[in-house]
Amino acid sequence: MAAKPETKVDTDADEVSVNGRIVKYQRYEYYLFNKPSGCVSATCDNVHDTVMDYITDAVHDDLFPVGRLDIDTEGLLLITNDGALSHELLSPSKHVAKTYYARIDGEVTWDDIIRFKEGIDIGEERPTKPAELVIKKTWQRI
């Protein structure tokens, strides 16, 4: 029984219980979240729902999304408080490939594939890093 709130706990050796229920220490939390359109990949936003608004059973309050998806984009997003893992996944020096699937309204041409391979100028200081564009399936209007 701890009488002082500042009592230190050894997470490897001590057992902590509250109202008779054992509380297990979790250093990191991991959520694989299917981000809906209209939601921003941020920890807080005064205008839009954030991915964090959907995580209601978190143990830690230091969770963050690993990477981002645009507001109109849907897809899987990792949410964690594991900074080392985030660095391993996001650091350009680690060369972790990312895969995106998109439904395109219009035709994708060979020139588009080449532009992706060379990097695309999106109006920032430098063009995007080279990427592989693969056409998996085409949709036809009937």
Regions found by a protein language model. Give the residues of each.
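Basic, flexible Lys/Arg- and Gly-enriched helix-loop patches that mediate nucleic-acid binding at interfaces
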Residues: 1-142
